[in-house]
């Protein structure tokens, strides 16, 4: 919330009606630089889904933060043009919801010219008592920074 005034434009994507109402209340005094878009973000434009590319392609995008309960792969696939064509973009993508996401997300971003790093800590995708007994701990977040001058993926500072 501290950086809202620094942003030219913020797009918030949300599918849940209850969260739409909460977001509208939270940001009602922030002016026109915040746009709340209702819909599921994925890799196709059908059945109520939309893609980040369909909304933001051709626009300057500096930062993407994504925590969408295991749909990060699909949303990133649907954001390929935005990720490819914004030379100063950074991102923080949650990677603990699905097995293998940290590796997939890192590889995908590396392929698009990002330097990537994975958070040091671990998270459990399920906090129920039974799952804590047999938890698969996963890395929490993949960070990416577009690098025009680096040929060494995996070194984000």
Regions found by a protein language model. Give the residues of each.
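Phosphate/nucleotide-binding beta-alpha loop and adjacent structural elements of enzyme active sites
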Residues: 1-157
């Amino acid at each position: 919330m501290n950086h809202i005034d620094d942003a030219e434009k913020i797009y918030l994507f949300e599918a849940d009606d209850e969260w739409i109402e909460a977001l509208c209340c939270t940001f009602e005094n922030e002016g026109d630089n915040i746009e709340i878009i209702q819909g599921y973000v994925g890799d196709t434009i059908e059945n109520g889904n939309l893609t980040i590319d369909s909304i933001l392609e051709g626009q300057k995008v500096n930062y993407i933060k994504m925590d969408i309960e295991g749909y990060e792969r699909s949303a990133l696939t649907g954001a390929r043009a935005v990720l490819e064509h914004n030379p100063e973009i950074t991102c923080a993508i949650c990677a603990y919801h699905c097995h293998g996401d940290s590796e997939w997300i890192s590889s995908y971003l590396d392929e698009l010219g990002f330097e990537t790093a994975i958070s040091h800590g671990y998270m459990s995708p399920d906090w129920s008592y039974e799952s804590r007994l047999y938890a698969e701990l996963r890395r929490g977040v993949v960070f990416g920074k577009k690098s025009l001058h680096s040929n060494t993926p995996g070194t984000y500072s």
